[in-house]
Amino acid sequence: MHHESPIRRRKTRQIHVGKVAIGGDAPISVQSMTNTETRDIAATVAQIRRLEAVGADIVRISVPSMDAAEAFKTIRAQVETPLVADIHFDHRIALQVMEDGVDGLRINPGNIGSLDKTRLVVEMAKDKGIPIRIGVNAGSLEKDIQEKYGEPTPEALVESALRHVSILDELNFHDVKISVKASDIFLAVSAYRLLSEKVDYPLHLGITEAGGLRSGTVKSAIGLGLLLRDGIGDTIRVSLAADPVEEIRVGFDILKSLHLRQKGINLIACPSCSRQEFDVITTINALEARLEDILEPMDVSVIGCVVNGIGEAKEADIGLAGGDKRSILYYRGKQVDRVENNDIVDVLEKRIRAEIAERQATRHEG
């Protein structure tokens, strides 16, 4: 049940954040940001490792001080994922983290001091092959732009972004990606669409300050979905007032839904009704908890009855259609067994892990 996406992605320049390619024909990357105190090295490393475990491509860390920059050096040595340092105002912090192995910078060249200070940062970034993300936010536009437009508008966000781009252009630096984030979906979507018409740099998508787990997921799915459907976007972050791990999970769910990237188990499940032959909701919750460590793409269908269950099961890699006391198990489109309803979770987990092991063995032999 693996579908090619009908979406034709916008062609952009390609950059690299560490080992991760962004733009061009590279897969859309999913990233998050730590919410620990960066100087708390143990907590920050632990959180990054949790993000790594669920498939984060890139992790951003706020580095607001030289003390935090010192901590960053130790953090960098203890994790594998490419790290982006989020820096404001003090160019010395940018210089320090570049010496200590940062993979990318999130700065706005216009707010880290004089042109000479900006030049120092840009020259080192160029020398070390470190890309810069220009991050414009509707809540922190420059004073003159606020006065010009009166309020955040798509044109205001794009003008701010292009102002920062022009500084890097003047310094002959083009290893750049850009974001123009807002908490309002319509503002953010319009700004990204306008920006995409003016530059060929890769774009980092996000609906900033989207809200808690439920409301933030909905806002991000709508906003990012609209842009991704237009072929706009090379890397995404789902901003949630929640565990950053959820940002990665939701991000991949958005990409899976649009057939833009497959990672992990794609669970297809009915919402359940009185026809269900087993407790679908409890079963799905248990499966999600047991299978969250799996990054291998696989479609698994779990439907509570045979009305839609058989058709869905035949389309999935592994599928189950509910039956009276015993449900029907399908593997690669064919019925292979009947499963006691009390054993569904155990049997499906075993089948899924066996299928993954077989795939990995086949790839290794190849």
Swiss-Prot record:
The keyword Repressor does not apply. Pathway: Isoprenoid biosynthesis; isopentenyl diphosphate biosynthesis via DXP pathway; isopentenyl diphosphate from 1-deoxy-D-xylulose 5-phosphate: step 5/6. The lineage of its organism: Bacteria, Pseudomonadati, Pseudomonadota, Acidithiobacillia, Acidithiobacillales. Its EC number is 1.17.7.3. One of its GO terms (biological process) is isopentenyl diphosphate biosynthetic process, methylerythritol 4-phosphate pathway. Gene3D superfamilies: Dihydropteroate synthase-like, Sulfite Reductase Hemoprotein, domain 1. It comes from the Bacteria. Its cofactor is [4Fe-4S] cluster. Binds 1 [4Fe-4S] cluster. It holds the Pfam family GcpE. Belongs to the IspG family. Disulfide bonds: none annotated. Converts 2C-methyl-D-erythritol 2,4-cyclodiphosphate (ME-2,4cPP) into 1-hydroxy-2-methyl-2-(E)-butenyl 4-diphosphate. GO terms for molecular function: 4 iron, 4 sulfur cluster binding; 4-hydroxy-3-methylbut-2-en-1-yl diphosphate synthase activity (ferredoxin); 4-hydroxy-3-methylbut-2-enyl-diphosphate synthase activity (flavodoxin); iron ion binding. The keyword Protein transport does not apply. [4Fe-4S] cluster binds at residues 270, 273, 305, 312. It catalyses: (2E)-4-hydroxy-3-methylbut-2-enyl diphosphate + oxidized [flavodoxin] + H2O + 2 H(+) = 2-C-methyl-D-erythritol 2,4-cyclic diphosphate + reduced [flavodoxin]. This is 4-hydroxy-3-methylbut-2-en-1-yl diphosphate synthase (flavodoxin). Keywords: 4Fe-4S, Iron, Iron-sulfur, Isoprene biosynthesis, Metal-binding, Oxidoreductase.
